[in-house]
Amino acid sequence: MSGHSKWATTKHKKAVIDGRRAKSFAKLIKNIEVAARVGGPDMAGNPALELAVTKAKKTSVPNDNIDRAIKRGSGQLGEAIDYQTIMYEGYGPQGTAILIECLTDNKNRAASEVRLAVSRNGGNMADPGSVSYLFARKGIVSLPQNELSEDDLLMAVLDAGAEEVKSEGENFEVISEPQDLPAIRSALTEAGIEYDTDDAGFVPSMQVELDVENAKKFMRLYDALEDLDDVQNVYSNADVSAEVMAQLDED
């Protein structure tokens, strides 16, 4: 599992996705505000803002919300909120490594809530650098498998800088260097292949395969972290077999 896509596509996750729609919108809006604050409101000259807006539109965030976020972030509606990116590290079931990426305007609140979620759900916080060395920052494009074959997808993106195509549950993930994301997106568009998400994230260099009981424990921990307002992304080297995933979906 490259980061978190497999956990996000279980039936368990789908069952609660409507309840988390507003929270997802809030995280996307926060990304837009930060991008506008750092690089200004002009998408033509601010690639980070263009990417944040594209992601928001793909998730059906209303245009009015997007426009207000750009204005708020660039200071057009008064003083912009000063968000900071913080990365926490931890361990989950079976010694799995976890990176917790926060975007917050209150470091103390974020730290307290993350520690509480981890400790209450069978995990342990780790010192900076303890697990981050197990991950590399990569470009990750996620798309539904549908009738697409892995070979056809690889042929479409190989010349654009794709390093690997992975099968992740019901999705494919195209892995590349972060700077190659625009070329990957263009290659997919030219090939008529629709994608769901594209972002820079953290990919593990090694994986830990979980049994059913530890997979359930990990999912509880993952859910608790994803539910926190300050948490933007959760990355892990936890993996499960197709058989274990099927059992999780049955519960």
Curated annotation (Swiss-Prot):
- Name the Gene3D superfamilies on file: 1.10.10.200, 3.30.70.980
The record's keywords, sorted A to Z, are: Cytoplasm, DNA-binding, Transcription, Transcription regulation
Work out whether the entry's keyword set contains Transcription.
yes
- Tell me the GO BP annotations in alphabetical order: regulation of DNA-templated transcription
* Protein location: Cytoplasm
Query: Which InterPro entries does the UniProt entry name for this protein?
Result: Integrase-like_N, TACO1_YebC-like_2nd/3rd_dom, TACO1_YebC_N, Transcrip_reg_TACO1-like, Transcrip_reg_TACO1-like_dom3, YebC-like
Highest taxon, organism lineage: Bacteria
Q: Name one GO molecular function term.
A: DNA binding
Q: Which GO terms describe its cellular component?
A: cytosol
Database matches in Pfam families: TACO1_YebC_N, Transcrip_reg
Per the record, the major location class is cytoplasm
User: Which NCBIfam families does this chain map to?
Assistant: PRK00110.1, PRK12378.1, YebC/PmpR family DNA-binding transcriptional regulator
Which family does the entry's similarity section mention? Belongs to the TACO1 family.
What is the name attached to this protein's record? Probable transcriptional regulatory protein RSal33209_2002
Q: What species is this protein from?
A: Renibacterium salmoninarum (strain ATCC 33209 / DSM 20767 / JCM 11484 / NBRC 15589 / NCIMB 2235)
